[in-house]
Swiss-Prot record:
Positions that bind substrate: T165, Q200, R308
One Pfam family linked to the record: Pectinesterase
Known tissue expression: Expressed in siliques.
Keyword Chaperone (UniProt): no
SUPFAM superfamilies xrefs: Pectin lyase-like
Organism: Arabidopsis thaliana
Cited function: Acts in the modification of cell walls via demethylesterification of cell wall pectin.
The protein, known as: Probable pectinesterase 8
Biological processes annotated in GO: cell wall modification; pectin catabolic process
UniProt entry tagged with the keyword Cell wall biogenesis/degradation: yes
Length: 393
């Protein structure tokens, strides 16, 4: 029962997070929030119903049991990708038991160590309440959902409950050449109050090299996406949080992503800042890391910086990105350490919208030129020509 009551409380927390009035007001159904909220409510009810039903397996209702099982799987898609057995293995996950695995972790566990072929874990729609670890010994794994608004992995650890921010992620990826498509990663721990200690609640930690995320969602409040280390590519993703919600020391390109601040709504005219999109962890000039955001949109609630200098050589750029007035006029923060002004690299180029006004930006912010930008805006920034195979995506 413990698991079930946990899953119900997680589900309620998710619905609270996703159906928060401010989110609906700011981001209508175009962002799939209603769909997520509805489908996850539905999956929660299914989960509860299925569990309740489970108690009757010992009664003499075998025919209806079978009938119910068949009806659950009737809708199961028959068009799982064709098997190209030379190069790809397919594993199938469905929480209702309609294929080989009912949890994502059990499918990951079934992949052989150091497999040279691509292992596609096809995950049917639904909410999977579990922590998932993809170890270093398992490269070449793809998690393929059915849409970030209908397939998600969720858990609710915080830094306090999991012995630190580095271990509280719902999903931890250490294997290289990891790919995720059309799936959400969620940490549904309650949104922290300002000043809460140990409230960091990470949705995913990406610590393997050469990883790509396409059409994915990342949901949490504080420290949502731990872009820890390695070269990573994000395209058409939806990233939501409030404080330092994209953080780490990876070298990553974010293209065509929607970035949504969930920071508290401030009273009109308030100059307070209550969040930051990025906290990049580059700590020396010798580290070839940094975040590049190209053709993204930034909106949401509260008043946030584009980045704050978590480490002295923090490096982040925004190019051709649309920003609402959720971005504070100064744009960036040096972690209240003026000695970092000379070493951080924060730049903007060709951005638009009320939040992109450069006239009041902090003095250390660089107005980039076309030559500088050319090296930062496409997949060559992350050496994509060496590893990023669009056929895998």
């Amino acid at each position: 029962m413990k698991i079930i009551s946990l899953s119900i409380s997680i589900g309620i927390a998710i619905i609270a997070v996703l159906a928060s009035k401010t989110l609906f007001k700011t981001h209508p159904e175009a962002f799939g929030i209603k769909a997520i909220s509805y489908s996850f409510k539905k999956s929660l009810c299914d989960h509860h119903h299925h569990h309740h039903h489970h108690h009757h397996h010992h009664h003499r209702h075998k025919p209806s049991d079978t009938k119910r099982k068949v009806s659950i799987c009737d809708d199961f898609p028959k068009n799982i990708p064709p098997l190209d057995t030379d190069t790809t293995s397919y594993l199938c996950v469905d929480k209702n038991g309609c294929c080989n695995f009912t949890t994502v972790q059990s499918a990951v566990d079934a992949v052989g160590n150091f497999s040279q072929r691509r292992n596609v874990i096809w995950i049917n729609s639904g909410m999977y309440y579990e922590k998932v670890v993809i170890p270093k010994t398992k490269p070449n794994i793809t998690l393929q959902g059915q849409g970030f608004d209908i397939t998600a992995i969720a858990w609710n650890d915080t830094a306090y409950s999991a012995n630190g921010t580095f271990y509280c992620a719902t999903v931890q990826v250490f294997g290289s050449q990891f790919v995720a498509k059309n799936i959400s990663f969620m940490n549904v721990a309650p949104i922290p109050k300002p000043g809460d200690v140990g409230a960091q609640a990470v949705a995913i930690r990406i610590a393997g090299d050469e990883s790509a995320f396409v059409g994915c969602g990342f949901f949490g409040a504080q420290d949502t996406l731990h872009d820890d280390r390695g070269r990573h590519y994000f395209k058409d993703c939806y990233i939501q949080g409030s404080i330092d919600f994209i953080f780490g020391n990876a070298k990553s390109l974010y293209q065509d992503c929607r970035i949504i601040s969930m920071a508290n709504q401030l009273s009109p005219g308030s100059k307070a800042v209550n969040g930051a999109v990025t906290a990049n962890g580059r700590s020396s000039k010798d580290e070839n890391s940094g975040f590049s955001f190209v053709n993204c949109t930034i909106g949401g609630t509260g008043h946030v910086w584009l980045g704050r200098a978590w480490r002295p050589y923090s490096r982040v750029v925004f190019v051709s990105t649309t920003m609402t007035d959720v971005i504070a006029p100064e744009g960036w923060n040096n972690f209240n350490d003026p000695s970092r002004d000379a070493t951080i690299f924060y730049g903007e180029y060709n951005c638009s919208g009320p939040g992109a006004d450069m006239s009041k930006r902090a003095p250390y912010v660089q107005k980039l030129n076309e030559t500088q930008v050319a090296l930062l805006i496409n997949t060559s920034f992350i050496d994509g020509d060496q590893w990023l195979q669009f056929s895998d995506l």
